[in-house]
Amino acid sequence: MRNLSGGHVEEFVLVGFPTTPPLQLLLFVLFFAIYLLTLLENALIVFTIWLAPSLHRPMYFFLGHLSFLELWYINVTIPRLLAAFLTQDGRVSYVGCMTQLYFFIALACTECVLLAVMAYDRYLAICGPLLYPSLMPSSLATRLAAASWGSGFFSSMMKLLFISQLSYCGPNIINHFFCDISPLLNLTCSDKEQAELVDFLLALVMILLPLLAVVSSYTAIIAAILRIPTSRGRHKAFSTCAAHLAVVVIYYSSTLFTYARPRAMYTFNHNKIISVLYTIIVPFFNPAIYCLRNKEVKEAFRKTVMGRCHYPRDVQD
């Protein structure tokens, strides 16, 4: 189980979801189906937005970035989990664990900031539709998207610098289905106070501040919706915003509960279950909430992606 060299753990063992073999098989089928559907949904959205000129606007530009992010996000955790279900082997090397941790934190932080940017974009579009083209030009949208990715990967690098300097002398059992920061901090034999403080502060900055921006934007959006004169218009706008807000609340609340509260490392079983929400469930529902219910996206998908699929047959006929 452990391979120690000079007092340093060279591999970790991920506990995952220890259950009976029949339930393991059921979980494998469930997560594998979610994984494939998530890949398909997000890939179709990325290609649709890329191929359709009618969607080359800031709103869909951000949606494309979100779907592209989800493609990487779900690949950080689920493939290793699926392999563990099949092989019953949860071992992961030290380097592999740190690599998974880095990309997971980077993509999670990027999503937090990107969701805030998307909420701000919707605020500008709904509360100032006449000024929206000048307030959100494509150049600003590009800079905001780049800032989202840059801040996410930079904050992850800062966390990893502190985590990688800690010593791991054993045990090497991680009570999680992927390499997360809290169980790793619990395994270290070094003084972890500074690393815990950095982790907590960065979690507050990268999760709480974007959440406040989202809440502020949607508060203004709801106030604008209430001023819509027709009940049909209000109902349509509310149904769209409620779906978006539900995803945002689930994602931010679960990440805040896991990372931005003191002594989070002592509730591994709860954290492991909650982690399923923002690592598997939210990426699965995001495309349906943000894009697949959107008439413009569906129409663009029909004309571009489906049209290209049928084009060779039309030529042959």
Curated annotation (Swiss-Prot):
It is a multi-pass membrane protein. Residues 1-25, 76-99, 161-197, 259-271 are extracellular. InterPro entries: GPCR_Rhodpsn (IPR000276), GPCR_Rhodpsn_7TM (IPR017452), Olfact_rcpt (IPR000725), Olfactory_GPCR1 (IPR050939). GO terms for molecular function: G protein-coupled receptor activity; olfactory receptor activity. Gene3D superfamilies: Rhodopsin 7-helix transmembrane proteins. Glycans are attached at residues 3, 186. Residues 47-54, 121-139, 218-237, 293-317 are cytoplasmic. The chain crosses the membrane at residues 26-46, 55-75, 100-120, 140-160, 198-217, 238-258, 272-292. Disulfide bonds join 97-189. CDD domains: 7tmA_OR6B-like (cd15224). GO terms for cellular component: plasma membrane. Keywords: Cell membrane, Disulfide bond, G-protein coupled receptor, Glycoprotein, Membrane, Olfaction, Receptor, Sensory transduction, Transducer, Transmembrane, Transmembrane helix. GO terms for biological process: detection of chemical stimulus involved in sensory perception of smell. It comes from the Eukaryota. It is found in: Cell membrane. This is Olfactory receptor 6P1. Belongs to the G-protein coupled receptor 1 family. The keyword Transmembrane helix applies. The keyword Disulfide bond applies. Its main location: membrane. Odorant receptor. The gene is OR6P1. Signal peptide: none annotated.
